[in-house]
């Protein structure tokens, strides 16, 4: 009896998480453009309030990016570890 695991699916899922993390930069920049376009709400695009909001937004996106990227790396590592263990166990039964 053969059991087939799809370790490639686990790796692909980890890669997808990491790609989504990387795409956050484009979303971040789009939000910053919108904030600057609505600068009057903040008292002008160059105002302290506007710049502080953009700074805080950048920090928040950085935390999200780092956590998502790290999670994707962990998922990929787990898939790789499972594949190696499965291969080692499988070859020991041969």
From Swiss-Prot:
A Pfam family hit: WXG100
Subcellular localization, as worded in the UniProt entry: Secreted
Cysteines paired by S-S bonds: none
Chief place of localization: secreted
Keyword line: Secreted
GO CC aspect terms: extracellular region; plasma membrane
Domain of life: Bacteria
Gene3D superfamilies in UniProt: ESAT-6-like (1.10.287.1060)
Cited InterPro entries: ESAT-6-like_Myco, ESAT-6-like_sf, T7SS_ESAT-6-like
UniProt similarity note: Belongs to the WXG100 family. ESAT-6 subfamily.
Protein name (record): ESAT-6-like protein EsxN
Organism, as annotated: Mycobacterium tuberculosis (strain ATCC 25618 / H37Rv)
């Amino acid at each position: 009896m053969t059991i087939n695991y799809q370790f490639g699916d686990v790796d692909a899922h980890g890669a997808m998480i990491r790609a989504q993390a990387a795409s956050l930069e484009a979303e971040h920049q789009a939000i910053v453009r919108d904030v600057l376009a609505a600068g009057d709400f903040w008292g002008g695009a160059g105002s302290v309030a506007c710049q502080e909001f953009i700074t805080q937004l950048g920090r928040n996106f950085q935390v999200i990016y780092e956590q998502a990227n790290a999670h994707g790396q962990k998922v990929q590592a787990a898939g790789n570890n499972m594949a190696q263990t499965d291969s080692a166990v499988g070859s020991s039964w041969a």
